[in-house]
């Protein structure tokens, strides 16, 4: 979604929200939460508050009028009814006409509500320096994580990683072979964005940064001499992330054409830009997702930018055997999330030994 459209959608949602949700939104902008995250949270709040009104839990006609006392006095049973409502609404699930939303979606909804409740019960201050209320019913609600072993996750994911020579092979394919699959009509669009697309993909493959971090990189954030890219991690923390040397060439090639091809000016600080009606603007995450899907499907298998991040992490662990190093590279606070990569590599090592 384009940034302008995203802002418009956020404003529409803000217009129907209770005042304390607007305070929450303003507070999280200062953290800063990304606009994408806040947009997703506002959508969850609209769904939840609409249910409060429609179910009669809140005795009001519109969600703007849902008072703080409704949230303060909400019972665990009320929340459980809301969760059952989500499970039993087929039309909320885009993947099925028979079942309600997935557990992942429910967890995301509860996470958004937990964030709002934490703000209202711990972070915000009224005129007396106290939170709006103290009772946090969200602490009584348990979330169910998707049940899957590391072995299962590793098996599902490793076929979608470009390991070993495939990392460079993927970039070479886009650079030299992909154009051969295109019609004459599609050639001009491909060549217009070829250097930019290669630079984006190379950055994620070489650094393992998140999609949101990649699209928000500014020109000043990338240092080709030290091979460091500065990004804003989750929670608003700035981080200096090293990238592998193979990406440097792709950045240089893109920078050679960026100004002329995308008609950028000194005001265009974004590193990755797109051109629409002769105006340059920061590329949006959905555009990157589409281009990664397009190129990867033609090369081997359709993947997401997050799988490119997994690729870097797995390759880095294979070289270092250090979960701490991989965690630092990815911007994780603990090494627990890197267990997946160790499992993938252990399986690869076992397969190699079996072939001896």
Curated annotation (Swiss-Prot):
Q: What is its main location?
A: cytoplasm
The record's listing under InterPro entries reads: CB, DNA_brk_join_enz, Integrase-like_cat_sf, Integrase_catalytic, Integrase_recombinase_N, Integrase_SAM-like_N, Recomb_XerS, Tyrosine_recombinase_XerCD
Keywords of this entry: Cell cycle, Cell division, Chromosome partition, Cytoplasm, DNA integration, DNA recombination, DNA-binding
The Gene Ontology biological process terms listed for this entry are:
cell division; chromosome segregation; DNA recombination
Q: Which residues are in the Tyr recombinase domain?
A: 169-354
Q: Name one GO cellular component term.
A: cytoplasm
Name its cellular compartments. Cytoplasm
- Mark the transmembrane ranges: none
* Active-site residues annotated for this sequence: 210, 234, 306, 309, 332, 341 (o-(3'-phospho-dna)-tyrosine intermediate)
Activity regulation here?
A: FtsK is required for recombination.
Q: Which SUPFAM superfamilies match?
A: DNA breaking-rejoining enzymes
Task: List the GO molecular function terms.
Answer: DNA binding; tyrosine-based site-specific recombinase activity
For the Core-binding (CB) domain, which residue ranges apply?
16-121
Q: Which family is annotated?
A: Belongs to the 'phage' integrase family. XerS subfamily.
- Please describe what this protein does: Site-specific tyrosine recombinase, which acts by catalyzing the cutting and rejoining of the recombining DNA molecules. Essential to convert dimers of the bacterial chromosome into monomers to permit their segregation at cell division.
Q: What protein name does the entry list?
A: Tyrosine recombinase XerS
Name the source organism: Lactococcus lactis subsp. cremoris (strain SK11)
